[in-house]
Amino acid sequence: MEVRKKTWPDLFQLMLDGKKTTDLRLADFEIKEGDVLVLEEYDPKTGSYTGRVLKKRVKNLNKVKLTDFHAVEDISRHGHWVIELE
């Protein structure tokens, strides 16, 4: 299964360069090992997608709860995905 997510330019570039192999996401969607995460570069300054796309296979999943990235209400309801990619 393919799962599409937008990614900001700095994080997209790190992933493209192979310097970033994990991705932290609010766990409000279905995903499993073997799925393909389709990262679509999104520029928050322009409010639009750049057209660059990167596909990565999900190698490992760990669901955790963190309060540094999302509202406590959202974290309590969903948790987070820590997604390791190949």
Where are these regions (language model features)?
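Short, basic/aromatic beta-hairpin or loop at an interaction surface
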Residues: 1-21
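Short, charged beta-turn/beta-strand-edge "cap" motif at the junction between a beta-strand
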Residues: 28, 42-47
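A structural micro-motif recognizing beta-strand termini
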Residues: 25-28, 86
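Glycine- and charge-enriched low-complexity intrinsically disordered segments
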Residues: 54, 61-86
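Short coil-to-beta-strand transition motifs
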Residues: 48-57
